[in-house]
Curated annotation (Swiss-Prot):
The gene is AMOT. Polyubiquitinated by NEDD4, NEDD4L and ITCH, leading to proteasomal degradation. Disulfide bonds: none annotated. The lineage of its organism: Eukaryota, Metazoa, Chordata, Craniata, Vertebrata. This is Angiomotin. There is a cross-link at residues 594-595 (Glycyl lysine isopeptide (Lys-Gly) (interchain with G-Cter in SUMO2)).
Length: 1084
């Protein structure tokens, strides 16, 4: 029918889930046996002929079945929630499995097989029958983590065993555990005493027909398996958390007879489970029977006991009072064939017999309660059941016992029933007794049918009540399921979290250890690395210092090289400029040479004319001599006459001449004073002009800088424009600064030259003031020679050109020195510098003859004295020399009184009457005859004519009044001894025209050429000449060391010279600078 069709499907689903979870999460060694169990479970039927193994047709009452199907469906819906933490339960199970094995043992293979067969057979088992599944399991059969109502602990029994098991149990599957909990909780309320069909309608009725209560059931669960006496029984209530306290207290009725011991033994003794199934369909026993034939029930119970149906123990417990019926009722041969096929027969029983079975149990219970003396027999029967229980456990430990092997237990239990054999009687008594029994049984059957009708009504009412109770229990079961699921989830999560926390603690501890180790290693590495880096840094510092030193050294060398390069470039530029200047000067000198050649030709002609003039002069002198002698005679005669007649006019004339001379001297002194004042004011003017020029330059520089700053800070101009402007400004500033520097140097040298000139003028004036009386005495006997040009002009021209050559000796330098030297001070050595030689270009234009500006005569004529050796670089041309009148008053050819060297200076004057007045004392004051008398510059024209003809050697040589005013000067260093007279250049009167020849300018000794006079001022002391350089002198600059070149202030009018090394220097003429006539006049 419908129930029978749905039973295999529903039970197989639950079993398959359990097996799948076990195969998935369980021990791999048990998977093979579980697969075999699953194959047996999904087969045609169980291998054992169990009473509950092959269920027959069930009742058609649908209300309990539908209710149970709803329950199963609800459990199936709730099961997947428990699978969410199955992996966590497996982890916790593995962690806690050693702890659980100490208290409980896992089920063996046979026990597991029995349980699986039970779950397959009891597919839609009622909650009452399923409750005993968990309750029947002893310590061996209980799987780990399944809650059991009965805990068989040998020591103590905790009252909260279920709670402790819930907290401590290790769940293999949460859904399996929750299903068993729900079955267990419902099983306490619905306790069927005897049934083989799990969902038969009388099953809930039997619970209320049973006089025993759940409290008595729990009372009997405490004793150990080896306790068989009633005294060992203890009254135990249900565990604290199980909902069985509110049951009806029916145990008060059954407690004096202690029927709970009967249930306790059958709870503990599983082999006697199917006895009730054997005796279930027997006729009711006689009420007053002594029931001696219990031994028959024992072999039958042993024969029918199967280890696969836990429900058989419940049926045996409910049907045990029926086993106490008389043996005549049990030994009928018609009922014994039911034993082997009792399961099949019970499946085909009609419904009234199935309903009669609980009634039998009820009547048996009343009969058992009416006979209190049967407690001893019950005790013996319990002992026998206990023996069968041990025997059945031994059979369960054998692997895979066949169903037929269960009958081997029958002969062991038969000898124990010997004491219950019936007493033999005669056949009449037996027949009469049988008739009585038939009557009694018929009456009893009639009564029992009436009772059965009443019981049907009660059962109907009780089914309604049970339906309500089942609904309530179902609701309660749902609550328990949800709460248990929630608690299990919470516990699983708590366990999982605790395990995770422990794992994280361990992991954290390991990480701390690793961190400490890593820190130590890192510290060691850092220390080693720091040591290495310190060493490396120290080495790098040392190398850096060395490299810095090398860099500084290289930078210094580079700066030096740059400065040297710049100097070389500047020198190259200067030399290029000087070369161009020299080339220009060479061209100019060639032009001048042509002009001078013309002059030479003219001079030759003039010399020829001079010779003629000399001849004419000699004739004229002779005539004059004659005339003079005649006039003297006349004068003497006139004087004699005047003395005799009147002498006053002569005195007046002499007085007039002396007064005129005194007046002339005063005028000349005043002129000199005025000229000195004019020079002073000119110097002040120049200084102020220089300062004004400096101020203007500084203002221009500041303005240029300000303009450059404004341009550089202007936001409209770009960086490139500002940079170009700045570079251009800097270049202009550099050029301007160089130009200003050159101008300053020139001005400084000009001022220095002016100072020297003024010093010379002062000395000349001092000497003139001393020598004025002697000059007046000598000039009183002289008269000017107006037929010839003044010797003062010639002398001044000669000396002025000498000073000009001193200021710019580049012509002589070009002629004599091939290794040209620049004129800047940085290119000159210390020994090449003279005291009075300027080392920078002088603003005074060189190579320009200084024009004489004589205040008295106003003559600007220049007598030219030149030599022919210019083209052969042997001699130097003596340019025209101009000497101002006040300077020319001093004697230029001073007698040199030096003890180390005596310089003979010979100056041949063309004009015989233009001999200086101081030349005679100079010649007379010479210490030895070797001292040459020099014909130097003459004094003012007024005093020039008073010099006598025989005043000096030079005057004798220059007797011709019309001779040219040329002088050949030769300077030669001599020994400390006085130079003999032949060392002098004898210039006879007829040979005065050849005085300028090169042959007459040679010294008798091969001495180096003399340098020009270093003083830039027109000093009237030395006239210069150039001697041809000997081979020993070389092409270098020719110098003349003059240790002491002094003029005797007592004898001559020349200045005192203190010069160590006289050098020819080549001051560079600034390009584009023209000669300044006014400056030349001022210097003159």
């Amino acid at each position: 029918m419908r129930n029978s069709e749905e039973q295999p499907s529903g039970g197989t689903t639950v079993l398959q889930r359990l097996l799948q979870e076990q195969l998935r999460y369980g021990n791999p060694s048990e998977n093979r046996s579980l697969l075999a169990i699953h194959q047996q479970a999904t087969g045609n039927g169980p291998p054992f002929p169990s009473g509950s193994g092959n269920p027959g047709p069930q009742s058609d009452v649908l209300s309990p079945q539908d209710h149970h199907q709803q329950l199963v469906a609800h459990a199936a819906r709730q099961e997947p929630q428990g699978q969410e933490i199955q992996s966590e339960n497996l982890i916790m199970e593995k962690q806690l499995s050693p702890r659980m094995q100490n208290n409980e043992e896992l089920p063996t293979y046979e026990e597991a097989k029995v349980q699986s067969q039970y779950f397959r057979g009891q597919q839609h088992a009622s909650v009452g029958a399923a409750f005993y599944v968990t309750g029947v399991t002893n310590q061996k059969m209980r799987t780990e983590g399944r809650p059991s109502v009965q805990r068989l602990n040998p020591g103590k029994m905790h009252q909260d065993e279920g709670l402790r098991d819930l907290k401590q149990g290790h769940v293999r599957s949460l859904s399996e555990r929750l299903m068993q909990m729900s079955l267990a909780t419902s099983g306490v309320k619905a306790h069927p005493p005897v049934t083989s069909a799990p969902l038969s309608p009388p099953q809930p009725n039997d619970l209320y027909k049973n006089p025993t209560s759940s409290s008595e059931f729990y009372k009997a669960q405490g004793p150990l398996p080896n306790q068989h006496s009633l005294k060992g029984m203890e009254h135990r209530g249900p565990p604290p958390e199980y909902p069985f306290k509110g049951m009806p207290p029916q145990s008060v009725v059954c407690k004096p007879q202690e029927p709970g011991h009967f249930y306790s033994e059958h709870r503990l003794n599983q082999p006697g489970r199917t006895e009730g199934q054997l005796m279930r369909y027997q006729h009711p026993p006689e009420y007053g029977a002594a029931r001696p034939a219990q031994d028959i029930s024992l072999p039958l119970s042993a024969r029918n006991s199967q280890p696969h149906s836990p429900t058989s123990s419940l049926t045996s417990g409910g049907s045990l009072p029926l086993l106490q019926s008389p043996p005549s009722t049990r030994l009928s041969p018609a009922r014994h064939p039911l034993v082997p096929n009792q399961g099949d027969h019970s499946a085909h029983l009609p419904r009234p017999q199935q309903h009669f079975l609980p009634n039998q149990a009820h009547q048996g219970d009343h009969y058992r309660l009416s006979q209190p003396g049967l407690s001893q027999q019950q005790q013996q029967q319990q002992q026998q059941h206990h023996h069968h229980h041990h025997h059945q456990q031994q059979q369960q430990q054998q692997p895979q016992q066949q169903p037929g092997e269960a009958y081997s237990a029958m002969p062991r239990a038969q000898p124990s029933s010997a004491s219950y054999q019936p007493v033999p009687a005669d056949p009449f008594a037996i027949v009469s007794r049988a008739q009585q029994m038939v009557e009694i049984l018929s009456d009893e059957n009639r009564n029992l049918r009436q009772e059965l009708e009443g019981c049907y009504e009660k059962v109907a009412r009780l089914q309604k009540v049970e339906t309500e109770i089942q609904r309530v229990s179902e609701a309660y079961e749902n609550l328990v399921k949800s709460s248990s699921k929630r608690e299990a989830l919470e516990k699983a999560m708590r366990n999982k979290l605790e395990g995770e926390i422990r794992r994280m603690h361990d992991f954290n501890r390991d990480l701390r250890e690793r961190l400490e180790t890593a820190n130590k290693q890192l510290a060691e590495k850092e220390y080693e690395g720091s040591e290495d880096t310190r060493k490396t840094i120290s080495q790098l510092f040392a190398k850096n210092k060395e490299s810095q030193r090398e860099k500084e050294k290289l930078e210094a060398e580079l700066a030096t090289a740059r400065s040297t390069n710049e100097d070389q470039r500047r020198h190259i530029e200067i030399r290029d400029q000087a070369l161009s200047n020299a080339q220009a000067k060479v061209v100019k000198l060639e032009e001048e040479l042509k002009k001078k050649q013309v002059y030479v030709d003219k001079v030759e002609k003039m010399q020829q004319a001079l010779v003629q003039l000399q001849a004419a002069c000699e004739k004229r002198e002779q005539l004059e001599h004659r005339l003079r002698t005649r006039l003297e005679r006349e004068l003497e005669s006139l004087r004699i006459q005047q003395r005799q007649g009147n002498c006053q006019p002569t005195n007046v004339s002499e007085y007039n001449a002396a007064a005129l001379m005194e007046l002339l001297r005063e005028k000349e002194e005043r002129i000199l004073a005025l000229e000195a004042d004019m020079t002073k004011w000119e110097q002040k003017y120049l200084e102020e002009n220089v300062m004004r020029h400096f101020a203007l330059d500084a203002a221009a520089t500041v303005a240029a800088q300000r303009d450059t700053t404004v341009i550089s800070h202007s936001p409209n101009t770009s960086y490139d424009t500002a940079l170009e402007a700045r570079i251009q400004k800097e270049e202009e500033e550099i050029l301007m600064a160089n130009k200003r520097c050159l101008d300053m140097e020139g001005r400084i040298k000009t001022l220095h030259a002016q100072i020297i000139e003024k010093d010379a003028m002062i000395k000349v004036l001092q000497q003139r003031s001393r020598k004025e009386p002697s000059k007046t005495e000598q000039l009183s006997c002289m008269r000017p020679a107006k037929s010839l040009m003044s010797i003062s002009n010639a002398g001044s021209g000669l000396l002025s050109h000498s000073s000009t050559l001193t200021g710019s000796p580049i012509m002589e330098e070009k002629r004599d020195d091939k290794s040209w030297k620049g004129s800047l001070g940085i290119l000159l050595g210390g020994d090449y510098r003279a005291e009075y030689v300027p080392s920078t270009p002088s603003p005074v234009p060189p190579s320009t003859p200084l024009l004489s500006a004589h205040s008295k005569t106003g003559s600007r004529d220049c007598s030219t004295q030149t030599e022919r050796g210019t083209e052969s670089n042997k001699t130097a041309a003596v340019a025209p020399i101009s000497v101002p009148a006040p300077v020319a008053a001093a004697a230029t050819a001073a007698a040199i009184t030096a003890t180390a060297a005596t310089i003979t200076t010979t100056m041949v004057a063309a004009a015989p009457v233009a001999v200086a007045a101081a030349a005679a004392p100079a010649a007379a004051a010479a210490p030895s005859p070797a001292t040459a008398a020099a014909t130097a510059a003459a004094v003012s024209p007024a005093a020039a004519g008073q010099i006598p003809a025989a005043a000096s050697v030079a005057s004798a040589a220059a007797v011709a009044p019309s001779a040219a005013a040329a002088a050949a000067v030769q300077v030669a260093p001599a020994a400390p001894a006085p130079v003999p007279a032949p060392a002098l250049v004898p210039v006879p009167a007829p040979a005065a025209a050849q005085a300028s020849a090169p042959a007459q300018t040679q010294a008798p000794t091969s001495a180096p050429a003399v340098a020009p006079t270093p003083a830039p001022t027109p000093t009237p002391a030395v006239a210069q000449a150039e001697v041809p350089a000997s081979p020993a002198t070389g092409p270098g600059p020719h110098r003349l060391s003059i240790p002491s070149l002094t003029c005797n202030p007592d004898k001559t009018d020349g200045p005192v010279f203190h010069s160590n090394t006289l050098e020819r220097k080549t001051p560079i003429q600034i390009l584009g600078q023209e000669p300044d006539a006014e400056m030349v006049e001022y210097l003159i």
